[in-house]
Amino acid sequence: MAIANKNIIFVAGLGGIGFDTSREIVKKGPKNLVILDRIENPAAIAELKALNPKVTVTFYLYDVTVSVAESTKLLQKIFDQLKTVDLLINGAGILDDHQIERTIAVNFTGTVNTITAIMSFWDKRKGGPGGVIANVCSVTGFNAIYQVPVYSASKAAALSFTNSLAKLAPITGVTAYSINPGITKTPLLHKFNSWLDVEPRVGELLLEHPTQTSLECAQNFVKAIEANQNGAIWKVDLGTLEAIEWTKHWDSHI
């Protein structure tokens, strides 16, 4: 997918990886970049607008833990304004295994609800034009960081959901792929808790291993967007982009 002249919605586009990715997207010249985030950051929005004045950058307050109905109301405003949306990026995520319910609500349920809401506008069975979904999951969806099992499980769930969406594309007209960052230097990595405090130093321990910068991650994120491969499971790690082959151990045969 060429990003130029596209209409893009980016949920959590002002976070660590999210903001660097928003910068890289704006450089590519979309027609509209609509950022949905739960915290206002006028300086960040102003920076994006200045980076490429030809791009219309719009911000709406959005908490992914709201209901499908509330998400649909906001999306209706956006579709009324833009008429069409080409790409939805779901980037919301928290890493704090002390907050079990919120971790699941943000990392998994929120993604499901946002996508369920946008299907009202995209689903070809309802006369929609289809669309593309990029879900930010995690390499912990491949193999858990066992000291943060709630986070890891929530990301595995998001990955599984994304894989299913891709297989449903012939029915819905909506394609999907996942972006799975490895250990990336962001504020998220420094401010989290392990489940039941099983490893108080888990953040420090992770940073003792090779990492990538959020800019490196963002640049490869944009390459994945441009590749636009339905069903792709992208590993974005150590400054590289790699499509993962998923191993099938069981088949429903339906």
Swiss-Prot record:
Positions annotated to bind substrate: 138
GO cellular component assignments = cytoplasm
Q: Which residues form the signal peptide?
A: none
**GO molecular function: any one?**
alcohol dehydrogenase (NAD+) activity
> What are the protein's UniProt keywords?
NAD, Oxidoreductase
What positions does the entry give for NAD(+) binding? 10-33
Which residues carry out catalysis? 151
Task: Return the InterPro entries for the record.
Answer: ADH_Drosophila-type (IPR002425), NAD(P)-bd_dom_sf (IPR036291), Sc_DH/Rdtase_CS (IPR020904), SDR_fam (IPR002347)
Which PANTHER family does the UniProt record give? 15-HYDROXYPROSTAGLANDIN DEHYDROGENASE [NAD(+)], ALCOHOL DEHYDROGENASE-RELATED
Write down what this protein is called.
Alcohol dehydrogenase 1
- Naturally occurring in which organism (per UniProt): Drosophila mojavensis
